[in-house]
Structures are given as C-alpha cells and as structure tokens.
C-alpha cells in the first residue's frame, strides 16, 4: 500500500508541476479552422487517414492554406502507445498489449509504425503521408494523456516489467518528439473546445 501511495503521490506531483507549462500548446494554435480528434483506440491508424483527408480537402476543395488550419489529436486509452518511441514499444511489449502484429515478422509489434511506417505496414491508407511524423510536419499537434500513461504504467507493473513509478517516468521521457503530454485528455479537450475547436471522435 505504501508503494502505491508513493506512486500516486509522484504522479500527482508530476501533474501539478507540468499542468501550467503543458497548456503552452494552446498558444500555438492560430488557425481559423479548428478541429479536435478524440482518439481512444488505435484502430489501424484510421485517425491518421482522417486527419490527412481533413487537411487535403481544405486545401484542394476550398483553397485554404495549412497555416489557417489547426488540428489537435488527443491520444489516450488503448491509443496511448501511439505517443511513445520505438524503444518503449520493444521494452514494454506494447504491441502485444494492444494485439498488433508486425507484418514484416509476424511477431508482436515492437516499433511504433504509426509514427514512421515502413512499406507494407497497415497504417492509415498505407502510405507515409498518413504517418504521425508527416502530419506533424503539416502542423498537426498530438497530445498524450498523462493519466493514461499512469494507468498503463500500473498495468505494465503487473506484467513484471518494472515498478509503476519507474515505467511512468520512462514513458514520459520517451514521448515522440513534438508530442505534448497533458495532465488529462478530458481537460485538454475541454480547453480546446473552449477555444472553438470542433470535436470528432475518430
């Protein structure tokens, strides 16, 4: 019980310290057209295809430049692993945890193919243009829920992969470049909608 209390206290402290700084992302979003994608499930990277289509249609059908569009993708739940680096997928067996298989090896996925897919990976529409990295270059902002990281850490501890506190710190320290960790997905979505972001669950 003491260890669990210590872990929860550590998570609370991290959240408290980072809450103000983690809201800095709100000031980066200047586009007139604003869309938030709520993503609790990996679903083969369907959201990445939706985001790409969203940007493409604004440009091709309406002539709107990407600088005038702001897109947020909020990752939590089973989609939490999408926000961390390959090293974490291998170390904590994240592919096995969400039942994903590497098409190149037929073994549980040990890399984040949503971030940087290889040829043949079943992500989005199967092209690099649907990768997280490509969408980030187009201005898309990915948010990662700290609460979800905490729940994943507790789950991985039960699998004998370390203590929850150590795992939580490791996952936070290996978020994908450009991914912003927020205290809670639900609060981030509320803050975005208060700033006129349309909402869609994807």
What are the language-model segments listed below?
Residues 42-44, 77-82, 142, 147-152, ...:
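Solvent-exposed loop/turn segments at secondary-structure junctions
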Residues 27-42:
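Acidic/histidine-rich, surface-exposed loop or edge segments in extracytoplasmic proteins
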Residues 93-118:
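A glycine-rich helix N-cap at a beta->alpha junction
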Residues 32, 67-71, 137-141, 195-198:
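Loop/turn elements at helix/coil->beta-strand transitions in domains of secreted/extracellular proteins
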């Amino acid at each position: 019980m003491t260890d669990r209390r210590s872990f929860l206290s550590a998570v609370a402290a991290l959240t408290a310290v980072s809450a103000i700084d983690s809201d800095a992302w709100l000031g980066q979003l200047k586009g007139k057209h604003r869309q938030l994608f709520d993503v609790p499930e990996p679903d083969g990277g369907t959201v990445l295809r939706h985001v790409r289509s969203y940007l493409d249609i604004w440009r091709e059908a309406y002539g709107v430049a990407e600088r005038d569009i702001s897109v947020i993708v909020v990752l939590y739940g089973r989609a939490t692993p999408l926000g961390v680096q390959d090293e974490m997928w291998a170390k904590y067996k994240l592919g096995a945890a969400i039942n994903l298989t590497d098409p190149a090896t037929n073994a549980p996925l040990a890399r984040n193919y949503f971030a940087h897919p290889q040829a043949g990976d079943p992500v989005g529409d199967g092209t690099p243009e649907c990768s997280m990295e490509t969408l980030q270059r187009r201005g898309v902002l990915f948010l990662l829920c700290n609460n979800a990281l905490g729940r994943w850490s507790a789950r991985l501890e039960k699998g004998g992969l370390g203590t929850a506190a150590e795992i939580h710190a490791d996952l936070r320290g290996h978020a994908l470049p450009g991914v912003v960790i927020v205290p809670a997905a639900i609060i981030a979505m509320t803050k975005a909608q208060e700033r006129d972001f349309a909402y869609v669950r994807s």
